[in-house]
Amino acid sequence: MRGNGPLEGEVKVQGSKNAALPMMAAAVLHEGVTVLHNCPRIADVFEMEAILQSLGVKTAWKDHTLMMDCKKIRESGIPGEETRTMRSSILLLGSMLGRCKRIRIGYPGGCTIGARPVNLHLEAMKKMGAEIRETEGEICGECPEGLSGAHIRFQISSVGATENALLAGVTARGETLLENCAREPEIQHLCCFLQAMGAEIRGIGTGKIWMRRAAALRDVEYTVPSDRIVAGTCLYAAAATRGQISLKDVDPREMRSVLTVYEKMGGQWEMRSGTLRANAAGIRFPVEKVSTMPYPGFPTDMQSILMAVLLTVPGESRIEETIFEKRFQIVEELEKMGGRVTVSGRQAVISGGRQLTGAAVCARELRGGAALVVAGLSAQGESVVKHAEYIERGYEHPDQLFGQLGAVIRIREQVEK
């Protein structure tokens, strides 16, 4: 890629990765057909599709519509080689226990951003009556009599554990009460999807969710909402280049914390006919401190992308990472481009205002890779981001996405489906 001045143009934001994946896991609960419209064609979705196919699910694509026929599940084992590259594979724990009353699944993988233990998932399944055994590299679960509703209070708010408990609760006998739930928009979208499938759920969007097993599950057609992190990435790329862009099909309510920081830096935006119109020409103010927090706080997935923007802003800014301990590993790569960042524990001090210069850098995880693209678009000269496959896990054709906004960018090898 090459810095080419301010980004300008309009893009339609893709469907949400973090909403689509749990919906795909939920599809196996029902002995029927599930159709997802606006489903992103990205590497993580393709990997989840391959896992479902290995279980016996028939799938078909038409543009951005994914059809999943789950009438016949032939297999309840998912080997480690299919799960170690994607964290969301653990969501099949709750849905497969609900459907088949047993599962054998390899430990999930994903981005190397820090410890993400599955103990909260396993404890929730145990409280619902499943017998869980952990062997080297595998989790084995059984519930011969089926799952039972339970009162589960999560020790810490966890998106994945909340999703797994919701999936298990769809078929569990009686009522299930979840407390200290994650409140991310993707949790809310999953609840609405499960309601469409037939589950009775109350408390959507709160930290306390009540649900009762579905009397009967039914076929579902559902539209995946837009991806708030992709929208935030485009917005912050415009901020880094002082551009003016329009983002179609976004919900600003899901982006409040991201937009608040954007405004503090001097950016302006408005909603007009369902389109977010952003003018970043006035970006010039550092931010005193931004701390990543569970929703509705500032998302950890946007932290490294914000860091890339702050390097272009004169003055000193601070970021505190409270979620994952390895989310500052991008600093070494940004320094190759001339960025000045000092890290102490969970705190990073960004000394911004110097012109970044193009360099060969290496993506180590999804959002850090996207941040390097944002930095490269604001840099002088040409930049090369190695291991772009990390970026393609969450961004559909990133070269086309940023190309529509005037960026000079290309990918040498691309994930296709």
Q: How should these model regions be labeled?
A:
Residues 1-417:
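Short, structured segments at the rim of ligand-binding sites
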